[in-house]
Amino acid sequence: MESLFPNKGEIIRELLKDPLILKNDSKRSNGSELELDSSDLLQREAILANELNILDNLKTFLNLIKEVKTNLNILELENCYYSLQSLRKKMRNNAAYLKQSFNFQQSISTYVDTLHLELVSTLYKILTNGFWKITENSIQFTPTVEWGKDKVHIEYDTFMDFVAQQYFPKGSLDNQAWFILDMTSADSQEQVRAKLNTIMKEYMNLSRIVSMIKNSIFISGKEISYENEKNILVFSKSSSHGQHCVSTVLTSFEAVCDFMLDGLAFRDRKTLSYELGPLFNTEFTKFVKNNASIILESLDSPLKNLVSVINNKLTRLVAKSEVTNWTHSGKEIQDLLMNKQLYYNLLLDKVLESHISEIRSIFEDPKKSWQNLEVVELTTSNTNTMSEKIGKNDSDVQNEKELHNAVSKDDDWNWEVEDDDADAWGDEIDVNIDDEEEKTNQEKEKEPEEEENAWDEAWAIDENIDDASLENGKEHLKAHDVGSLDKDHIEVTQLPKLFLAISQNFKSSFADSHVDEQYFAYKYNLLQTSYMAMCTANFSHNWCQLYVDMRYLIERDEKLYRIKELTRNLLETKLNMKYRIVCQLIRHQLTEFRENERNPSWDATIEKLLPYILKEIVRPLQKIRGEEGSRYLLSFLNFLYNDCVTKEILKWQIISEVNSENLGELVSLLVNNTDIQLLAKEPSYKKMREKFATMGKFLPLHLKEIMEMFYNGDFYLFATDELIQWIELLFADTPLRRNAIDDIYEIRGTALDD
C-alpha cells in the first residue's frame, strides 16, 4: 500500500473525507477533525477486504445459479446439469459459504433443490409430451422435437444418451448419486426420485409400451394399426371372426413389427426386442400352426403370403435389434408354408370339423327326427353255427369242458366263461345293487317325459314289474316276448342311414387327394369315435337300441373298424356291470341261506334278482336278436347257472337238509324265470337248462331217490366226479353213501369200458 501511495498524509486526508470511517456524525458536524492512527485504519481496511472477498465468493454462487437457470431456460440441459453439479461442489467445499449462518445456507440449498426438481421435470415433460405420446389407445414416437417458446431443436438419441449416462450410468437409478444425495429437502428429493424412477421404467425400459403390446397381440378382439406418416401405433377393438379374425391378428402383429423396425431408435428397438422377442417368436409360430387350416386354405392364400412377409420381418427384427436372448431364422414357418402335404392334411382337418358339426346337428334337432324307427332286414347266421359254438357232445360229457374252452378261444366276443376264471367275479369290485337302481331311477327322472314315453312305446318294454309276481316266487316272470316283428326283421333309428351318408361324403372328399393314407385313416377313426360318443350320450338308457343301430351300420359298411371296436366295447361294458350285479345278488342269497337257513329272506332273489335279469339282461338281449343276441343270452345263462350258482354251492363244506331244500327252490326259481323262447331250438340251451333243472330236482332228495335217478340215467349230463362231489356235499360219510359212490364208479366204469 505504501509503495502505491507514499504520501501518507494525503491518504489520511482522503480517508477522513469518507463518512464510513468517522466514529460518529456529531463530531463531523461539529467540524472537529478525527485523528486516526494509521494502524487502526489498516486493520479496518483488512476487515473490509475480507468482507469484500466473501461477497465476491457469494457472488460466484449467484452467477452459477443464474447459469443453471439460463441453461434450463434455453434447454441446454446437459450444460444445466454440469452447472448444477459445479454449484453443488462449491456448496460442499467453499469456506466462505460454509461460514455463513445456517439459515442462509438452508435457504440457498432449498432453492438449489428446486433447480434439481425443475431440471428433472423438464426432462420428464420432454419425454412424455415431446418424444413420446402414450395414451390408452395409442403409442406415438417423434425422434426430433422443437421444445419451449424458442422452439429449441432436440434430438432423441442425443437426449437419451445424456439421460442414460448422467442419471442411470449403471442401468438403474443410484440413490447415492450427488444429484439426489446432495438435496436437503426431503419432499423435493422424493419428487426427483419418483420422476427419475418413472423415466427409468417407462422410457428407458419402456415397460408401459411392452405391456400394451403384450396385451394386444395374438388376441382375438384386439386390433393394432400402424400409421407410418405419424409414426403411431393405434390400439382398438375388433369384432372380426373366423378367417377375418386370423387376418386381423396377423396384420396387427405386422404393424408392431413395422413400428419397431422403422419407427424406433436403435436403443428402444433393442429394448423392446429383448423384452418381447421371445414372446413374438413363440406366439407367432404357435398362432400360425394353430390356424394353419385357415392360413393354408388354398395354395395361393393371401394369408399365406402375409405370414411369409411377417416371417421375414421378424427375421430382420432379430438382426437389427442385436439381442441374444432369442432367435428367429424363419425356416420353421417357411417350411410349414411350403409343405403341400401339410396343406392337404389341414384341409382334411377342416373337412373333419365340418362333418363332426354335421353329426352334432343331428342330435340338436328339436323334433328328434333321428329317433324315428324303421324296419330293416335282420342278417342272421345259420342256427347250426351257433350250436357248434356253444353246443355239447351228447355222447361224451367230459368233452363238454374242452368244447367250452375251444368255443371261448374262437369267440371274437370273448364272453364265454372258462373254468380257470371261475372266481373272477369274486375278485371284482363290490357293487351295491340299491345304489345302482337308485342311480338309474335318478338318471331317468332327468330325461324329458315325452322322450322317455317315446322310447318306451317304441321298445314296448314294461317298466312296471308286477308287485304280486315279485312277492310270490312261484309266479314266473316269462321272458319269451320278442316283440311283434317277425324273426327276419328288426327296427333301427335313422342314425345308421345318416352316418353312412356323412361317412361316404367324408371319404369322397379325398378320393383323389394327396392326403397321407395313415393320417386319413386316423381322422376317419376320429370321425367314427366322435359319432359313437355322441350316440352313446343320447342313448344312455337304450344301449341295446344303440347296439342294434351300430350292428346294422357295420353290416352296411364293414370298413367302419373303429365303430365295430367301440360297439363291441359298449356291449361288453354294459353286460360286464350287469353280470357283477347278478353275481352279488346270488351271493347275498346264498349268504342268507347259510346264516338263516330255517327262515331265510328271499328278497334278494324275488324282489331284485329275477326282475333285474328280465329287465336289464334278457329283454335287451332279446331285442338285439340275431346271432349276437342268442350268443350273449347263452353266455349269460352259462354264467348264471354254472359260475354264479353251481360253482358257488360246490365251495360249501356241507349242505344241510334244510339248505338243500332252499337251494333246490332257488334253482327252480331261476330255471322257471329264464325260459327264453328265442333259444328254444338251441341244443346247448336245452342241455344247459336240463342239467341245471336236474340239479335243482335232486338237491332236496334223499340218497335213495338220487340213486334211483342215477339208475334211470337222469344224470347223463353230469360227469362222474361231479356227481360224486354233489353226493359227498349233501350226505354224511356213511356206509350207505360209500356204497352209492361205489355203484356210481362201477356203473360208469363199465359204461366207459363198453
Swiss-Prot record:
Changing W425A: Loss of interaction with RET1. Gene3D superfamilies: 1.10.287.3290, 1.10.357.150, 1.20.58.1440, Retrograde transport protein Dsl1, N-terminal domain. It is a peripheral membrane protein. One of its GO terms (biological process) is ER-dependent peroxisome organization. Residues 406-440 are annotated as: Interaction with RET1. Residues 406-459 are annotated as: Interaction with RET2. It is found in: Endoplasmic reticulum membrane. Keywords: Endoplasmic reticulum, ER-Golgi transport, Membrane, Protein transport, Transport. Residues 1-200 are annotated as: Interaction with TIP20. Residues 425-438 have a biased composition (Acidic residues). It comes from the Eukaryota. GO terms for cellular component: cytosol; Dsl1/NZR complex; endoplasmic reticulum; endoplasmic reticulum membrane; nucleus; RZZ complex. Pfam families: Dsl1_C, Dsl1_N. Residues 425-454 are annotated as: Disordered. Component of a peripheral membrane protein complex consisting of DSL1, SEC39/DSL3 and TIP20. Bound to a SNARE complex consisting of UFE1, USE1, SEC20 and SEC22 or YKT6 through direct interaction of TIP20 with SEC20. Binds the coatomer complex through direct interaction with RET2/COPD and RET1/COPA. Binds TIP20 and SEC39/DSL3. PANTHER family: CENTROMERE/KINETOCHORE PROTEIN ZW10 (PTHR12205), CENTROMERE_KINETOCHORE PROTEIN ZW10 HOMOLOG (PTHR12205:SF0). Present with 8970 molecules/cell in log phase SD medium. Required for protein transport between the Golgi and the endoplasmic reticulum. May tether coatomer-coated retrograde transport vesicles to the ER membrane through interaction with coatomer as well as the SNARE complex. May contribute to the stabilization of the SNARE complex. This is Protein transport protein DSL1.
